[in-house]
Amino acid sequence: MKISPATISILKNFATINQSILIKPGNILATQDTVPSIRSIAQVTEEFPVRVAIYDLHKFLGTLAMMGDCDVDFQERKAVLKLGKQQVEYIYSNANRVKEASIKRPTGGEFFTCHFSDRDISTILKAAAVFSAPVLSFVGLNKVATLSIGTPKSENFDSPSDTFKLELGECEDDFDLRIPVEVFKVIPSNYNVVLNRKKFMYLASTTTPLEYWLAADPESTV
């Protein structure tokens, strides 16, 4: 089988969340960080025939890049990558070294929904980098919800700071849900977004079967 560019993109994103991944037979990929404060699940076009434990996902992706448009044969203990006369045997890790992602869909607690475009996500990531922002602040005030990216007042001692703002729409209640920038590791795409009173943010892509659950700062008020 060949691994599509879309699936490689997802694996690259997952590698920023956790260096290891345990792939079950089928077409579902899932990951979480060690805390866990980030969880993600994706449905891909490939059908993995066996259980695949990869301890160093960056190394596996590097091997794929090295072999180019190769065929990958996922066997019981190894993956065999072939391209013309070239071949690589990539040995799986011991499954005990790779923790399986636990994806449990929370129910209830939703209090605000909005939509992010692919461009919104890219701009949010750029703004966080440009302003060295520690958090993304989702603020509901006077019936208007806004995403604010800058230095929170509590950390800035009320001095002026550069701030990027994105109006998200109308809201019922006041809130301040803070998502640490370090957990906002999402692939730019179009997303339906849900903020939850259990202090997390949920994103579901509208263009591909990809979902994220991101934990908020415990000091958030909702």
Question: Positions of the model-derived regions?
Answer:
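DNA polymerase processivity clamps
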Residues: 1-93, 109-222
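Secondary-structure "cap/kink" motif recognition
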Residues: 102-107
